[in-house]
Each structure stands twice: as structure tokens, then as C-alpha cells.
From Swiss-Prot:
GO biological process: chemical synaptic transmission; neuropeptide signaling pathway
Function noted in UniProt: Tachykinins are active peptides which excite neurons, evoke behavioral responses, are potent vasodilators and secretagogues, and contract (directly or indirectly) many smooth muscles.
Name of the featured protein: Substance P
Record-linked InterPro entries: Tachy_Neuro_lke_CS
Localization, UniProt: Secreted
Keyword Secreted among UniProt keywords: yes
Residues modified as Methionine amide: M11
Family membership: Belongs to the tachykinin family.
Organism annotation: Scyliorhinus canicula (Small-spotted catshark)
Entry GO terms, CC: extracellular region; synapse
Keyword annotations from UniProtKB, A to Z: Amidation, Neuropeptide, Neurotransmitter, Secreted
């Protein structure tokens, strides 16, 4: 399960 920081980091 990806962390919120990783999700926004990809964007």
C-alpha cells in the first residue's frame, strides 16, 4: 500500500 507522499511524488 503506497504512502500519501509517494502518490503525490509520482504526480
Amino acid at each position: 500500500k503506497p504512502r500519501p507522499g509517494q502518490f503525490f511524488g509520482l504526480m
